[in-house]
Amino acid sequence: MARSQQRVPHSGVPEGRKSTQGLIYPDIPFPPSTVQQLPLSIALDKKILSDTQRSSALVPNLVNDLFPKASFSITPNVIVKLCEKDFYDLTDWKWLYYPGSSKKADREERAYATASFLNKLTRLCWLLYRDNQRPLPGVPRRWSVIESPRLLADGSKVASCGIALAEAGPDDMQWSHMLCDVQIESTAKGISLAVQKLTTGAAHVFATQDHRLFHLGLALAGDTCQLAYFDRAGRVLSPKFNVHKHPVLFARAIMGLTVLDKAFLGLDPTITLREGRRFLEVNQQEYEIMETIHIKTAMLGRGTVCWRCRCPSDDADYVIKNVWVEEKEEHEEGELLMHVQQVAELRLEADELVLRPDGEPYTTTRVRESHEGGKRPIVPYWIPDLVLRRMVLEPYARPLRDFSSKEELLELMLDALKEHEKIYEDLHVLHGNINDDNIRAFDDPVLSRRRGMLIDFANAVTVSGQPATGAANEAVGTSPFTACDVLLCPRQVEYGPWHDFESFLYVLMIICATCSGPSNTHRQGFDIRKSPMAPWYASDGNRKADIMYLDSDAKFRAFLDRTFDPYFDDLKDVVCELRTLIMFRKNRQPTHVDVMTVFYNHIRARQANQARTTPSSNHAPLVAGAKHNGNGRKRRGDPTPVSSPSLDASAGAPRGMTTRAKSRAAPPREPSPASDESDHTVVQTPPRRKTRASTKRAQSDKQTGMATATRAAKRRKME
């Protein structure tokens, strides 16, 4: 047979699916010379397996629901009849080339034999479709043997030899290529173990494929088969069945995976490919996907995916966010964003449900509500009903880790704190999920530097009272950045701004531990999950609290010495001061002014120190964060710190600060040496374009003028 000449990247969506007559399934030599290795690329623990098991449902007609008879040009029962004698023995009710459970072969041999059988069956289906001039996918798919670590229920990892379905192409298999995951056990007793191993594959597929709506896995244990369907609400299983006694059902599953469009396999059909470029549509406006900027690695839950997209009509960049939300709360995030954008930089341009080709919304309940054949599915009541929404947001902003200098890192966090204060004071809302991904840097058209902003208000907490607090819940926070009190007692604690302040502190600590310089320079050979900060990532609230609350100043400083990259040695003072202010609350809780004072004074000290150590010349000194002069360098006109309207440089330390904090706020007697950042790359982003939201911002600025004056008066009274 001649190979197909059509080749596209595994992650792409092939063009030209309608006219594929004459395409011959490639005669690919199989098995390949080596087993494809798939290492783990995301952190997994036994909780993901227990959560998946807890959210598991049994749907009697799952295979028929996923691959309905009407979707096949040649039905599975016709295929089975055509396979008589050559591939399936109707007399003995047995697939002729299927590896028997009685064979005493090792796992790798069994995987090769099973993959060979599946490829032969797939090739037979393709040839029958071709000979009858029926439509076929644009790129052939093949089954390849893979080896990968798999997580078990007890938290241990085992090396597993299985099979992956992917589009035919290079042999460098990756998780992002996988269309279906197959786990194999030698006898029927191992079916539960095979299903258990499929969870690892599902988690990696969701974490590496931004266009995934659901994922399918196949468990083969001896002659027993079970189909597993994974989505953001959990897992759905088909009943177990014998591949020999139910040949049509087995053929339906294999044909659905290999001859139908990839939408049947869980890929989003609303994302289209034209000339190698991806497009999607929101509110009847088409956008081109320029890059994927975020994929939520947690398999269960909201499954947030964010893209940087460009609108052809105004040539502006936007962020488009895909998110699964509770059906009963589907409008809440959009309504909250409309409220928050009165004072925040984040703007909501469009918000709508993502619809299936039949006009119905994408939901996680559809597959769980099948009543075909009179058998009701077994679905636990606690499984959430999720719907898929798509939002268009602006401005597009860079991650905090793209800071160009340590001074800019502090400035961006200070900007985010100022915005946090506005939202809290004016709108009585707390962010509730401060982390290193939700603080962003955008090019401000007014200031001569990038400015920090907050994104993702999905976990926001509405507050009231004095001081204004709200009810915390299990959805608040991202584990490594969550305040100790919230980790230990999420349902009892009254969530206040000081909990978000603690998250700001952890953002700074984690960046100092995982980066080794500006411009998102990753720290080589360092695994934070194996470092002294491991309790942050293990959700160990007790150990985390011991370090933050109980360790002496000297012991905590030693903890930072063991954890921080040397590049950030001169930021340890900032972290220690913030820890004293936020964690050691004596007579009152810290305020926004208290926390911002720490940041502002350290920024001012660094600027003053740079002014003293920079040799004089005919040109203004260069600093990061100043206005671009057109040749890739940055210029500062005046080294004197500019007084902030929300934090007067001439003001003393706010009342209520600890003695240590007051001493920190005073001008330094012996400034620490300035860090040399001349050998690091300065991150530059294109100037921000004027977009549809520019006029909205001008209107909201007028509305918030009075609120800003009120806050300034409060600070004067406090000081």
Q: Predicted segments — roles?
A:
Residues 506-516:
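Short conserved helix-turn element in protein kinase catalytic domains
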Residues 520-636:
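Long, cytosolic, alpha-helical-rich C-terminal regions that act as interaction/scaffolding modules
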Residues 483, 494-506:
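Activation loop
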Residues 424-444:
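Catalytic-loop of the protein kinase fold
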Residues 442-477:
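Activation segment/activation loop of eukaryotic-type protein kinase catalytic domains
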Residues 471-489:
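Conserved activation segment of eukaryotic-like protein kinases, specifically the C-terminal portion
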Residues 1-398, 406-411, 427, 442, ...:
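Eukaryotic intrinsically disordered, low-complexity regulatory regions enriched in Ser/Thr and Pro
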Residues 414-425:
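Short C-lobe core helix of eukaryotic-like protein kinase catalytic domains
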